[in-house]
A protein has these predicted regions:
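Conserved N-terminal glycine/acidic-rich loop preference
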Residues: 121-124, 147-185, 192, 196-241
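Catalytic nucleophile-elbow at a beta strand-turn-alpha helix junction centered on a G-D-S/GDSL motif
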Residues: 39-57, 61, 131
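Sec-exported extracytoplasmic/periplasmic mature domains
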Residues: 75-79, 101, 116-120, 177-187, ...
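Catalytic His-Asp segment of secreted/periplasmic serine-dependent ester chemistry enzymes
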Residues: 196-295
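C-terminal region of N-terminal signal peptides and the immediate post-cleavage residues
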Residues: 8, 17-40
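N-terminal export and membrane-targeting signals
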Residues: 1-12, 108, 167-171
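Conserved SGNH/GDSL esterase-like catalytic core that processes O-acyl groups on lipids
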Residues: 57-173
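Solvent-exposed loop/turn segments at secondary-structure junctions
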Residues: 47-50, 88-94, 128-132, 197-201, ...
């Protein structure tokens, strides 16, 4: 997701090896099972993966990567053989597969260039910028006390057409094609599509976060719909989907500051508005590492 410019002045988650010995030879030494070979890991994605404003910022400045983002957490936990993080704030699907990304640090290569036949593990978080998720959320901000004339859900679903749902339907085939392109580059790689989390609880928490209840529910339901589309594409294109909504329930932008996995409109943690916090990145990284170890 892009770092939004908000009008109030803010710019903008071993396998246990049991050794079995023969009953007839209780004293025989049983060799340890060989450890899994270290993985060659590549991380692709947008700012939901890169970690803007989370200390310490590393890599290309224009991509706003943190050394505490979930790819770094995964790499450390799995003790990978090699690790390449090409996640970049503002990325859209085309920046992964075909079009260099323009940033404040200059054009960045297509992210897929980092994937090779030797790559064993790929994580990817993409889609939020494709459908304008953050800009939609920013457009729903209001400091009015009444919902009259201030419900962006009504505007975004005017005439019976849900524009966000339409954008998801339009972009979903491209997500599948992107996964095919990754698999073509790394035929033996395990590909994990990492979804977007629970940013808002039911009804939100207006005015603590300046999104009216109807709009909070609309935004989160749109995130859920995008996740479902990403999951479907993953399943249809030989990848796996990592659900981060469930693990982030109770850790949304309305949670206590030290419990947030996603930062609010006015940041109270070192993270970009409406983006993961360091705690969120740690939780997401833990979940991914656990999934990789389990199979």
């Amino acid at each position: 997701m892009r770092n939004p410019g908000i009008y109030v002045g803010i710019a903008v988650a071993v396998s246990l090896l049991a050794a079995c010995s023969s009953p007839s030879a209780p004293d025989a030494d049983v060799p340890d099972a060989p450890a899994s070979a270290p993985l060659n890991y590549v991380a692709l994605g947008d700012s939901a993966a890169s970690g803007p404003r989370i200390p310490e910022q590393v890599g290309v400045p224009g991509c706003e990567q943190s050394d505490s983002n979930y790819p770094h957490v995964v790499a450390a936990q799995l003790e990978v053989a090699s690790f390449v993080d090409v996640t970049c704030g503002g990325a859209v699907t085309e920046n992964l597969v075909s079009t260099p990304q323009s940033t404040s640090s200059g054009d960045q290569p297509v992210q897929l260039d980092a994937v090779t036949p030797e790559t064993d593990l790929v994580t990817v978080t993409i889609g939020g910028n494709d459908i304008g998720l953050v800009s939609t959320a920013v457009g729903c901000l209001t400091f009015a006390n009444s919902s009259t004339g201030n419900v962006c859900k009504d505007r975004l679903t005017a005439g019976g057409v849900d524009t966000v749902a339409a954008a998801i339907a339009d972009k979903a085939p491209g997500w599948g094609a992107m996964l095919d392109a990754v698999a073509e580059r790394a035929p033996d790689a395990r590909i994990l599509v990492v979804g977007y989390g629970t940013y808002l609880p039911d009804g939100g928490c207006f005015p603590t976060q300046p999104v009216l209840p109807e709009d909070a529910d609309y935004i989160q339901s749109s995130i859920t719909a995008m996740n479902q589309a990403l999951k479907t594409q993953a399943e249809e294109h030989g990848a796996e989907f990592v659900d981060t909504e469930a693990l982030s329930v109770g850790h949304d932008v309305c949670a206590a500051v030290d419990q947030r996995y996603f930062e609010g409109v006015i940041p109270e943690n070192p993270a970009a508005p409406l983006h993961p916090t360091a705690a969120g990145m740690a939780a997401i990284g833990d979940e991914i590492a656990s999934i990789v170890r389990s199979e």
